[in-house]
Amino acid sequence: MLKQLTEKAIPAFETSFPGCQGLFAFDNAKNHQKYASDTLQSGNLNLTPGGKNTLPMRDGWFKKAGNPVTIHTQCMILHDGHVKGLKIVLEERGLWPTNRKLLTQCTIPGDTPGQRKPNPACKYGSNTDCCAHALLSSQLDFQAQKGELQETLEAAGHMVIFYPSFHYE
């Protein structure tokens, strides 16, 4: 989809309407909301730096209280090339608690003894400081992530809208 957009749809629009800004409309299919591989997603971070399943991330940003309020850019990669861990990212933002333990991700008892499963309250963000993933996911830069389709169109100077989800019953 992205390849068709960048190689065919955008060039065709710009050739047909030079100097104009396009408004591209898409349904709300899951593949239209796909994130870029370097997007800020707390689920892509381990508690400690690096790890097998981590992907390089773009820089984040956060506001620091003060007079005036300042915005700081935060590199998500350490000098040795490893992706920072949740603890380091939260410490740099002044969000890592000093008086209590913070779990990587909340879990609740599963269906069988000894089994654990993700806590739905955590997954849907109703408790933003219950674990490191929820706390970081609630930050403005992580909340502001857009899908790759939207980022591509906006970078090309165009606009995009997504139709509301509709499920006929």
Segments from the language model and where they lie:
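Short functional hotspots at interaction and active-site rims
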Residues: 1-169
